[in-house]
Amino acid sequence: MMNPRRLPPLPSSTSSASAADDMDPRVWRRLPQPLVDRILACLPTPSFLRLRAACRRFYHLLFSSPFLHSHLLLSPHLPFFAFVVPAAGHLLLLDPTATASWSRLPLPLPPVAGGPAAFSPAAASAGLLAFLSDASGHKTLLLANPITRLLAALPISPTPRLSPTVGLAAGPTSIIAVVAGDDLVSPFAVKNISADTFVADAASVPPSGFWAPSSLLPRLSSLDPRAGMAFASGRFYCMSSSPFAVLVFDVAENVWSKVQPPMRRFLRSPALVELGGGREGAARVALVSAVEKSRLSVPRSVRLWTLRGGGGGGGGGAWTEVARMPPEVHAQFAAAEGGRGFECAAHGDYVVLAPRGPVAQAPTSALVFDSRRDEWRWAPPCPYVVVAHHGGAGAAGFRVFAYEPRLATPAIGLLDATAPVALHGMHDG
């Protein structure tokens, strides 16, 4: 049994004035219990985790299917970002809103005695984080809910690979995972030939999911597993380099195609992200990249484009530049980045860019772009930089993903999930 005193409150994104208002117990005692449950279901996940220590009944709501279903439907969307340092044993969560703050959440991965982590962060979707096995060969993909510490593994991937690129799209009752590239054609050689797609849906047979027939990647594809994939309108998008191109995978058709990116000769550290979406509308695919062109008429910058009409087939789609980093902000960002590249993710209206640093350290800085307000601002320094002290394991360094803390991730129930070990709250100290 966990001790609720060990869970300091996560900084709230709401105003401090509301926190000063006390609840009148004479009112709350007289409220019908169904109404109280309805109110609790409307709370953000961090707020409910703090409140569950108030009484035993609130705690037991965590194991009530009707309550978890209501919370999934009614609780507000939280556009958090998860920074994953493979050797650190925990996530660093950034709340990018106006009162930006950091918090910490333990990772539920099983420990590996006497060696580096056997799984590395690969993707995230709908409150789930995906971790890919490091060993070459047929890959294991683990899905984890860090809040409930629920773990589930997909069936072993059918094609042996070295370091493939992973995409994940999870809904309340479905999971789609793509494992692409780095086919092991021999014990000593890899080629970007194919992709494997796993599909699980509560309405499918079997509901526990299956690996679809492999799909062929476009010729001359060169994938970077750190770049990951974006998902929108039933399609996955990922970057190919040398030269740069955007690969598009239509899940329903099981077919890949190419879309040309803007200014492809002058891109550096490009990343594809999902902008917008959530409960307010469909997500758009966006390209975030540094632009470096020798001509003085095109100064160095970081730009953001969105794609319209980027479907399958003949490589159609039009890119529209929607934002450009201001020169004074870019000067600070370029100094922090130092030519090492940057990690990038988008969640709702927010885009986070984090300069890459030393292997075993968490990010020292993060730049937040609010696309709705067209505003660039630096997040406060991460207070947990020194906690990544488990040696030099995880040579790829940290990754950043869009992450929404959720009490309920019912899609993971489609897999053979392990029982929850314990419930973890979010630590801010």
UniProtKB/Swiss-Prot annotation:
Q: Which domain of life is it from?
A: Eukaryota
Looking at the UniProt entry, the stretches that span the membrane are 72-92, 112-132
Tissue specificity is: Expressed in apical meristems and the lateral organ primordia throughout development. Expressed in seedlings, roots, leaves, shoot apical meristem (SAM), developing panicles, and, at lower levels, in developing seeds.
The protein's matches in SUPFAM superfamilies, at most eight in alphabetical order, are given as:
F-box domain (SSF81383), Galactose oxidase, central domain (SSF50965)
State which pathway it belongs to: Protein modification; protein ubiquitination
GO BP terms: cell differentiation; flower development; maintenance of meristem identity; protein ubiquitination; regulation of cell population proliferation; regulation of DNA-templated transcription; regulation of flower development; regulation of vasculature development
* Bias (Pro residues) ranges: 1-11
User: What happens on changing I39V?
Assistant: In PBN6; bigger peduncle diameter due to larger vascular bundles, increased number of primary rachis branches (PRBs) and of the number of grains per panicle, thus leading to increased grain yield
Instruction: Please report the residue spans annotated as repeat (Kelch).
Output: 229-277, 284-339, 350-397
* Keywords assigned by UniProt, alphabetized: Activator, Developmental protein, Differentiation, Flowering, Kelch repeat, Membrane, Repeat, Transmembrane, Transmembrane helix, Ubl conjugation pathway
InterPro entries according to UniProt: F-box-like_dom_sf (IPR036047), F-box_dom (IPR001810), Gal_Oxase/kelch_b-propeller (IPR011043), SCF_F-box_component (IPR050796)
Question: Per the record, which residues fall in region Disordered?
Answer: 1-21
Record-annotated F-box domain positions: 25-71
Report one GO cellular component: ubiquitin ligase complex
Q: What does this protein do?
A: Component of SCF(ASK-cullin-F-box) E3 ubiquitin ligase complexes, which may mediate the ubiquitination and subsequent proteasomal degradation of target proteins. Together with FL/APO2, involved in the temporal regulation of meristem identity during both vegetative and reproductive developments in an APO2-dependent manner. Promotes spikelet formation by suppressing the precocious conversion of inflorescence meristems to spikelet meristems, probably via a positive regulation of class-C floral homeotic genes, but not of class-B genes, and through the control of cell proliferation in meristems.
Q: What is this protein called?
A: Protein ABERRANT PANICLE ORGANIZATION 1
| Organism expressing this protein natively | Oryza sativa subsp. japonica (Rice)
Record lineage: Eukaryota, Viridiplantae, Streptophyta, Embryophyta, Tracheophyta
Q: Which gene encodes it?
A: APO1
